[in-house]
């Protein structure tokens, strides 16, 4: 029975739609369908060409302008960075040259002070050496005179002890001859 009910309900639906089938495939309505297709396509074309496409083109142009400006700004910043690097390198080289110049000046000043101190020390040493040589010469001269006096006294005492006559001039001449030669 369910089969007959289903067939009866299905038959009623077919009768309501008619026996022609799908209306899109009905050749009698193709002219009307083509007309409305063309009208719809023209309306879509007009909407796209007048409203949507200009907006899209404006957005694309704006993006292209932004990209171009960003690229130009990047090139400008790159040039500034290269310029800053060159200025930094030049300043660094100048600072190194200045430091070397200051170090050379300081070395020269220190060397001059050292040379001056050495010259002063050499002069003091030479003066003290001259004084020492003078003192040594005086001591030698005094010692030589003392040796001559002691030698003359000893020779006189020996001559007297040996029983000879003490001749002071002869003893002094003999001592002078021995000490000088």
Swiss-Prot record:
Topology within the bilayer: Single-pass membrane protein
Bilayer-crossing regions: 34-54
Low complexity bias: start-end ranges: 1-18
Alphabetical keyword list: ATP synthesis, Cell inner membrane, Cell membrane, CF(0), Hydrogen ion transport, Ion transport, Membrane, Transmembrane, Transmembrane helix, Transport
Region annotation (Disordered) ranges: 1-20
GO MF, any single term: proton-transporting ATPase activity, rotational mechanism
Subunit and interaction comment: F-type ATPases have 2 components, F(1) - the catalytic core - and F(0) - the membrane proton channel. F(1) has five subunits: alpha(3), beta(3), gamma(1), delta(1), epsilon(1). F(0) has three main subunits: a(1), b(2) and c(10-14). The alpha and beta chains form an alternating ring which encloses part of the gamma chain. F(1) is attached to F(0) by a central stalk formed by the gamma and epsilon chains, while a peripheral stalk is formed by the delta and b chains.
Family, per entry: Belongs to the ATPase B chain family.
Function per UniProt: F(1)F(0) ATP synthase produces ATP from ADP in the presence of a proton or sodium gradient. F-type ATPases consist of two structural domains, F(1) containing the extramembraneous catalytic core and F(0) containing the membrane proton channel, linked together by a central stalk and a peripheral stalk. During catalysis, ATP synthesis in the catalytic domain of F(1) is coupled via a rotary mechanism of the central stalk subunits to proton translocation.
NCBIfam families for the chain: PRK13454.1
Official protein name in the record: ATP synthase subunit b 2
Species of the source: Ruegeria sp. (strain TM1040)
Gene (name only): atpF2
